[in-house]
Amino acid sequence: MAYANSGGVKLHCEETGSGHPILFIHEFAGDHRSWEPQIRYFSRRYRCISYDARGYPPSDVPDDAAHYSQDIAVADAIAVLDHYDIDKAHIVGLSMGGFAALHIGMRHGQRASALVVAGCGYGAPKGKQESFQREVDVLADHFERDGSEKAAEVYAGGPYRVQHRNKDPRGWAEFR
């Protein structure tokens, strides 16, 4: 298993294929395996790199909340590129990973050949922000009180994934 180091945190990463590199950044509640179908296809012509974000084993899981932020997520992705001596790559991210990819493009544009940013923001329209904040607070309480395994069930079945369930019932069932 390969590990990149980002500020003392070990990030599990994998590489396959050859050619111009593509860095895949996974979504919340996913991991490097989320990209397996894409990597199987693109590794025929590209050097594909995926990794588990901090907090997602086998990457390190720091206890202190100060070790998690959008700035740190960007630094982690750059650390993975540096681990493989990659100056420039296509950056592909989904949801949480899409937000990181977007910020890589804004802060480290010279490192990105292209950005593929999918579902990078949940947010809420102005009229629903208070309701959205309450839902997020309830989910955060579940994670803190019950741990990630039980909270994942709340997340998978809650309003956070209703659009996934509506658009792709088979994919949603697999996600659960």
Task: Indicate residue ranges for each PLM-predicted region.
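Alpha-helical elements of Rossmann-like donor-binding domains used by nucleotide-donor carbohydrate transfer enzymes
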Residues: 34-37, 41, 72-79, 103, ...
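Conserved HGGG/HGGXW glycine-rich cap/lid loop of the alpha/beta-hydrolase fold
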Residues: 5-66
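Short catalytic micro-motifs in class I SAM-dependent methyltransferases
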Residues: 27, 95, 99, 103, ...
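Active-site micro-motifs of SAM-dependent methyltransferase domains
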Residues: 30, 55, 98, 122, ...
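Residue-level detector of beta-strand structural context in well-folded domains
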Residues: 1-2
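Flexible "cap/lid" loop of the alpha/beta hydrolase fold
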Residues: 102-107, 112-145
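Conserved alpha/beta-hydrolase catalytic His-Asp/Glu region
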Residues: 127-131, 145-176
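Active-site loop/oxyanion-hole signature of alpha/beta-hydrolase fold enzymes
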Residues: 40-43, 49-92, 96, 107
